Amino acid sequence: MKIVLAYSGGLDTTVAIRWLKETFNADVITVTVDVGQKDNFEDIEKRAYIAGATKHYTIDAKKEFADNFISYAIKMNALYEDVYPLSTALARPLIAQKVVEIAKKEKVDYIAHGSTSKGNDQVRFDLAVKALYPEAKIIAPARIWNMTREKEIEFAKARGIPIKTESSKYSIDENLWGRSIEGDDISDPSKEVPEDAFEWTKKKNNGKITLSIEFEKGIPVAINNEKMDLVKIIQVLNEVVGSYGFGRVEHLENRVVGFKSREVYEVPAALVLINSHKDLEKTVYSPLEFRFKKYIDSQWADLVYQGLWFEPLRETIQLAGDNLNKWVTGEVKIEIEGNGMRTLGRASKYSPFSEKVASYNKGWYPTDEMARGFIEIYGMHSLLTRQVRE
């Protein structure tokens, strides 16, 4: 029997290697997907083999993550419950996709992951595997063994598996698009998040910084007139604006699995790019397009958060988003100060803004007759309804 395991290199999945090997008498093939996390992948590979893996794959998927997942999160202004840019949720279907590719390559129909029965990730991972490889059988050791962190450490020590036993106050999930922070010290939503929980947004620079972000068809292509690919743009923004203390998100999140959870994220680049993109959309869209886009944006974000990346509706909504983003070309100038961002200006060749029409000092004015006629017809629904109810 062979099992392909999505392997992060952390305690849970390291213990899972040996547990799967012993429980199922299986050969375990581990797959680590690089989606921009700041890990030492050579160390992760060594750890996998020490724990008992028979084969290990490290897959660099940063560009694919940016081009095929993050790009759509930007175009769809993806903020779950108006605040969370879906950093973890976006990465899960890609990781599952890469694990499935290895499983098919190795002719293995057992796939394992380290998600618990309490988290959203189990839903995202299981549904992605079911969509891409319906014949596969999914094993989630953490849903079966019910081991605490202490028991996992004991399990590893008893088998000679080297584990860093110093307790960390926080559980971190990191990728190109963001850093999520969990732990007992921040689980109480009535208490302030301790400063030591943050890494990307530790304030190193005081004052403010001004940046210009250039977009082509909804995709960011340059910072301060310097062209870069999307991976580089995200990396630069995370480092630069994060150093001013910008990019922190804290909210009480409605999880897929049925309860509320206090969630904390560091997402500097995501917030800069999504908010700049939203501003440029408002610049170029008609009012009807703008209202419609706001609606489908929220639907897209909900589907992705809920683990439904392979839901046909997500693809349909995305097609509409692509069509609307054809006009989202231009530049947005922003200012970052602390955890605040404001727009200084924006410009696009597709903006229907007309100074001649909008200016109060010169140009076009409707006549009194035109204004009266417009107001009469515009307010008719409201006035007639009010009259019959009085």
Swiss-Prot record:
EC number from the UniProt entry: 6.3.4.5
Catalysed reaction, written as an equation: L-citrulline + L-aspartate + ATP = 2-(N(omega)-L-arginino)succinate + AMP + diphosphate + H(+)
Binding-site residues for ATP, renumbered to this chain: A6, Y7, S8, G9, G10, L11, D12, T13, T14, G114
Gene Ontology biological process: argininosuccinate metabolic process; L-arginine biosynthetic process; urea cycle
Binding residues for L-aspartate: T116, N120, D121
Enzyme class: ligase
Domain of life the protein comes from: Archaea
Pfam families: Arginosuc_syn_C, Arginosuc_synth
Gene Ontology MF term list: argininosuccinate synthase activity; ATP binding
Keyword Nuclease: no
Binding site for L-citrulline: Y84, N120, R124, S171, S180, E253, Y265
Localization, UniProt: Cytoplasm
Pathway: Amino-acid biosynthesis; L-arginine biosynthesis; L-arginine from L-ornithine and carbamoyl phosphate: step 2/3
UniProt record similarity statement: Belongs to the argininosuccinate synthase family. Type 1 subfamily.
Assembly with partners or alone: Homotetramer.
Name of the protein: Argininosuccinate synthase
Organism whose genome encodes this protein: Sulfurisphaera tokodaii (strain DSM 16993 / JCM 10545 / NBRC 100140 / 7)
Name of the coding gene: argG
